[in-house]
């Protein structure tokens, strides 16, 4: 399968551009949403078969997990594992990423709703505080997580679940990155937060700026680096995780 490359704003646009599908694989669905003002997003619900995560790019988001609502600012992260009740709303103009891992039919649900049809996917309406305990939920303010330092890079683990490993990489100029490689058991993808890192995908080298997205499906050769001169930050998403977060720990010990 060919790699996916979306420059800023690109992807499958729905609801007049308010939601853009960046990735739609069996293993994960990633959307980028823009809420122009404070408004409701999703009422309390849970997913039986997948985790639901959020990363705020701009503005403010209020995320309910179990029976507790937390306010997320740019750079903050939240994750509701399987069967944990959650919902969200924007508190101002807000732009954020939403990760469903595995996809759970979320992308097709959005397409159906965009056509005016009922839709439906792995989602069950529920009261706050019902369902599985929220003790396994993840909340990290901007910059927080498990910080692992390596040569010319810092990797901050935001989520390390069976369904997904989500890492925020800070890449100094000169970060060489891994050699081109493939995965035979998961999708590896990247969202550029800052700078202009370089990606190798489908035998091409691309310098991509903030707001760009790259996905390497199973069997797709890929790599990433930061030739500089600026520092770069990227979100790296492995779905399923296949223990990538544990391998990072080993490399950093």
What are the roles of these predicted feature ranges?
Residues 31-47, 150-152, 167-183:
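Conserved short histidine dyad/triad with adjacent acidic residue
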Residues 26, 82-107, 218-244:
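Ligand-binding loop in jelly-roll beta-barrel domains
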Residues 5-6, 67-83, 203-219:
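Short acidic-glycine-tyrosine-enriched beta hairpin
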Residues 49-61, 66, 185-197, 202:
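Glycine- and acidic-residue-biased ligand/ion/polar-headgroup-sensing regions
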Residues 1-29, 114-165, 173, 253:
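A short, N-terminal "cap"/entry segment at the start of jelly-roll beta-barrel domains
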Residues 57-58, 73-74, 92, 193-194, ...:
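A cytosolic small-molecule/anion-sensing beta-strand core signal
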Residues 91, 98-132, 236-237, 241-252:
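A hydrophobic/aromatic-rich effector-binding and dimerization subdomain
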Residues 21-24, 42-48, 89-90, 157-159, ...:
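Short histidine-centered beta-strand/loop micro-motifs
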């Amino acid at each position: 399968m060919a790699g996916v490359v979306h420059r800023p704003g690109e992807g499958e646009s729905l609801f007049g551009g308010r939601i853009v599908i960046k990735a739609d694989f069996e293993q994960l669905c990633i959307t980028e949403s823009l809420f122009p003002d404070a408004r409701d997003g999703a009422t309390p619900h849970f997913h039986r078969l997948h985790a639901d995560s959020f990363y705020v790019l701009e503005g403010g988001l209020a995320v309910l997990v179990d029976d507790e609502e937390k306010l997320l600012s740019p750079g903050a992260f939240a994750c509701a594992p399987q069967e944990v009740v959650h919902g969200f709303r924007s508190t101002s103009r807000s732009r954020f990423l939403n990760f469903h891992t595995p996809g759970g039919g979320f992308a097709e649900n959005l397409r159906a709703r965009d056509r005016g049809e009922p839709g439906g996917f792995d989602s069950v309406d529920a009261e706050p505080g019902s369902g599985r305990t929220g003790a396994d939920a993840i909340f990290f303010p901007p910059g927080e997580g498990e910080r692992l330092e390596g040569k010319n890079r810092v990797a901050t683990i935001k989520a390390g679940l069976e369904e997904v490993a989500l890492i925020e990489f800070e890449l100094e100029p000169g970060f060489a990155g891994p050699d081109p490689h493939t995965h035979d058991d998961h999708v590896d993808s990247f969202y550029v937060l800052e700078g202009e890192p370089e990606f190798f995908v489908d035998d091409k080298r691309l310098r991509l700026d903030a707001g760009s997205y790259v996905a390497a499906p199973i069997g797709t050769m890929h790599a990433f680096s930061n030739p500089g001169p600026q520092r770069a930050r990227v979100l790296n998403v492995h779905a399923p995780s296949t223990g990538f977060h544990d391998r990072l720990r080993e490399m950093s010990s």
